[in-house]
Amino acid sequence: MFELNNFDSIRIGLASPEKIREWSRGEVKKPETINYRTLKPERDGLFCERIFGPQKDWECHCGKYKRIRYKGIVCDRCGVEVTRSKVRRERMGHIELAAPVSHIWYFKGIPSRMGLLLDMSPRALEKILYFAAYVVIDPGQTPLSKKQILSEKEYRDSLEKFGPKFRAGMGAEAVRELLQEINLDELSAELREEIKQSTGQKRVRAIKRLEVVEAFRQSQNKPEWMILDVIPVIPPELRPMVQLDGGRFATSDLNDLYRRVINRNNRLKRLLDLGAPDIIVRNEKRMLQEAVDALIDNGRRGRPVTGPGNRPLKSLSDMLKGKQGRFRQNLLGKRVDYSGRSVIVVGPELKIYQCGLPKEMALELFKPFVMKKLVNDGLAHNIKSAKRMVERVRNEVWDVLEEVIKEHPVLLNRAPTLHRLGIQAFEPVLVEGRALKLHPLVCTAYNADFDGDQMAVHVPLSAEAQAEARFLMLSANNLLKPQDGKPVAVPTQDMVLGSYYLTILKEGAKGEGRVFTSMDEAVMAYDNGEIELHSKIKVRMKRVVDGVEKSKIIETTLGRLIFNEAIPQDLGFVDRSDPDKIFDLEVDFLVGKNELKKIIDKSIKVHGTTKTAILLDKIKELGFKYSTKGAITISISDMVIPEVKAKYIKETEEKIEKITKQYKRGLISDEERYNSVIAAWTEASENITRALINNLDRFNPVYMMSQSGARGNINQIKQLAGMRGLMADTSGKTIEFPIKANFREGLTVMEFFISTHGARKGLADTALRTADSGYLTRRLVDVSQDVIVRETDCGTRKGIEVTDIKDGNEVIEELSERIIGRYPVGNIVHPETGEIIVEAGRMITDQDAEKIVKAGIKKVRIRSVLTCHSEYGVCAKCYGANLATGEECNVGEAVGIIAAQSIGEPGTQLTMRTFHTGGVAGEDITQGLPRVEELFEARKPKGLAIISEIKGTVKISETKKKREIVVTSEDGETRSYLIPYGSRIKVSDGDQVEAGDELTEGSVNPHDILKIKGVEAVQTYLVHEVQKVYRMQGVDINDKHIEVIVRQMLRKVKVEDPGDTSLLPGGLVDVFDFEEENAKAIAEGKKPAVAKRALLGITKAALATDSFLSAASFQETTRVLTEAAIKGKVDPLVGLKENVIIGKLIPAGTGMSRYKDITISTVTE
């Protein structure tokens, strides 16, 4: 049985006139839409019921047949078929044109396909199509040549000279005749010959032409189909006309455009019937051509057709393009039923896997379930009365709702959803009021706060959806970030403050040194005010060891005892194998935010997520309870200004006076003076800050808040009670007058004014950053969306070599971090003892990584997606661990999207500023987000470094006019490089350099690295450089995410010599397809093709995908579709995006084809 939704691929091509007529249910002959009196569609008009179907269900136009019983009858009076009105969404019509017109996409696109086929310039073609010149179709026995362009005058002269011996024409008819005469096979052979013979521009043109010719040859499209005889009319429901209040009508722009075409077409028919003079007919044909152009792509040629208010009308192309177009608005993102949204409030009483759902919202969301249960329980007789009960909100309904909700998870989402933790599943708990309640620990993942944020709720309906929500999306199972595998559900703010307060130790507190027989006794003493939480006390601890109860007195505080009650005592902070330490508390230290992170991390590793979820809730309760009990508040007197501040300021002012004197005497330059002043004030600011921190009491609330990591940092305290310090002006240059005051003392007007630059720049920066970061994420998702783990092991023996990533001498990312959770290529052997630390094929754990670093190993060869041999997607062994679980990655994991989200999500944190290095004419070094974009788009960087193309010895020569570096290799080959003024040279005279080494400072062009040092070098370079940017901002991202993107950038090869294969010279081909073609050629004893790896930027790479649906929905929709139609492309539907567009399950996770045939059966208990 053929099912419409069950297909494996989708093909796009040019439509032949026959095909268009076959789609159509009738010809639209009149430009009328609806009758202004009856408001019924006009017959043969754009909304005609006879062509497109009835407007009302089961009712013909004249009203002779009404009701469903006449289904399928065609009315004998009005000719309308009695059927459902929704056929008006799918039935098409057509317009028979009186003269053929060209399709603007194929004539005007870049490159002009029609022009390439006919070997004519687009300008000449435009003249012919728009009736400004003649073209010779058949020169006969005359000296004219075929396809020669004749002006009006030349044509008349030739007519006089040669009479009827030759044929020339104008307009689309002439072009169609020329297209029909083309013999593609002959032309293809000719062009291949020409490519072998010619060089330069001629060869490039021939290659371009061959591409178009081959596209037509292989797709079975005929060139003359680029000229339209008949135009399809899309269904009326897709270009609706609706009545507004006040009796006016609003109509889709397409109707206006169609109307113009029909009017002009009818006028042309009439003129032809009347036998009007040629010049009038020609003008009308030109106008018809322009009307059709406007309908297909308004504004592509000449001035766009405008509607009322000078607004360009939206043509068929505009309906597909952009964010509001069909692809992105309706196919990739749809609004869904069973959803609601509301403001969020905090729910500290909830468990981590729960959320509070307002009662009225829950009732509406679960309405069908409630109705069914009411009927099943016999509370209502039928569904209709159940619906009434729910609508009247009877008391029984609430009890039923409670039961329905019990085992039914809901999804909560907060916009913007930057990574997959932006949607998580929770078990709903009914709450009064109209706000959603959110657990405080999941706020970090959502980046939510309670200052008025809203969130959306969605209900998973099917059994499978509920199972996925429960097992994969439940918040308790998502405690780790997919970016770097660190915990994301870490207590913040009050909870941190509470834990800090609870575990702090106070010397000389009340009851210090008292001894208690048990913890209970200590708690009693505390309740009676005998001791404080922070007093040092001794308590006898009891533990059962090997079945024997032992005890020992330990020194600690009551707070720490209480805190440890919540914490498992086997996390590994204390070495329990040591008999002296059996009784020690697991957490016997001051707990701030970082310590909490460590506790949770260890708990997940030791006990797994379920136990950790319980631990998190316990810490949350303790934190809230004791931050309330501690009652830590801020008063203005807590900002204690250090006494030494005045002294430091005075000293610095004296220092600056000296500097200014030196400058006035001409001993130092202005630049040096400026730098010294800045350095002096920076030092003063740091000294004051240090004095301030040392001056604050350990129990000062401000100090506690910042030390524990609950809120605020040193920098903010410095501004409150130290000195505000130096400010930057609008260009980012530091102003040399610092703000000496702090907020406690108050600023002078001048100081306040200086500080406004920075404040505003911050806001402007943030707004720009958000947009840029979102666009970067979108491009990353598009380039990597079809990377899915497709198999367990691809069996490759290749890998990449990893070392510490360094920037100068500073280690940015350590080796251990880079190898945890990866598979080694071979055995990793201890260099001295020769013992095997990790066998090949076993994942490197944290402990292994420690051993490797201890053994002094500096380089490790690991498997990587960069060298993975899976044809589509990657394999689990090359990818390594799934960071969100720490286990091996499952087949079906959508690692491409995870990679894109992991790189895109922190994008907003990266700074925008391109900052100036001091010194003479310092190059701008791009940093932050623009640098990441520059790398991923593989652009030529700003501040380009010159690199050596050969290995050899350096000689630097400086003359008055120029600096030059000459590199001489051992075999006498030399290369010389001119050094622009202001560049800093990195090498010195007589140095040995390798090919690809930098000669001057700056960023290297990745394309040069690929050319000189090869593929592995450019991969390493890109990964390292992106890591540098993120690590500078303190953002940790695992290498594998960047590797996934880089793999996609290097997927293609550029064919240099096609040999005897069917590949086209200069074409971009997938690496795997290329290897396959060559293997085929070699097997047949033919000459294989030669190609070079191509490095594409992410936008280019996303558009170069095999899937035209994915590319068209990304950018440049018309260009992608034009090309795809000519090539007759088939979309194999392997990626995620294409499947979303056509409405199938995505081929990842349980949607993979290998799981498709599994049937689900319900087990009744």
Curated annotation (Swiss-Prot):
Cofactor note (record): Binds 1 Mg(2+) ion per subunit.
Listed InterPro entries: DNA-dir_RpoC_beta_prime, DNA-dir_RpoC_beta_prime_bact, RNA_pol_asu, RNA_pol_N, RNA_pol_Rpb1_1, RNA_pol_Rpb1_3, RNA_pol_Rpb1_3_sf, RNA_pol_Rpb1_4
Subunit structure: The RNAP catalytic core consists of 2 alpha, 1 beta, 1 beta' and 1 omega subunit. When a sigma factor is associated with the core the holoenzyme is formed, which can initiate transcription.
Superkingdom to which the source organism belongs: Bacteria
Reaction(s) catalysed (UniProt annotation): RNA(n) + a ribonucleoside 5'-triphosphate = RNA(n+1) + diphosphate
Keywords, comma-separated and alphabetical: DNA-directed RNA polymerase, Magnesium, Metal-binding, Nucleotidyltransferase, Transcription, Transferase, Zinc
GO MF annotations in UniProt: DNA binding; DNA-directed RNA polymerase activity; magnesium ion binding; zinc ion binding
Cysteine pairings via disulfide bonds: none
CC annotations in GO: DNA-directed RNA polymerase complex
Family from the record: Belongs to the RNA polymerase beta' chain family.
Cofactor(s) for this UniProt protein: Mg(2+); Zn(2+)
Binding site for Zn(2+) 2: C794, C868, C875, C878
SMART domains according to UniProt: RPOLA_N
Name the record gives this protein: DNA-directed RNA polymerase subunit beta'
UniProt: Mg(2+) binding residues: D449, D451, D453
GO biological process, one term: DNA-templated transcription
Gene: rpoC
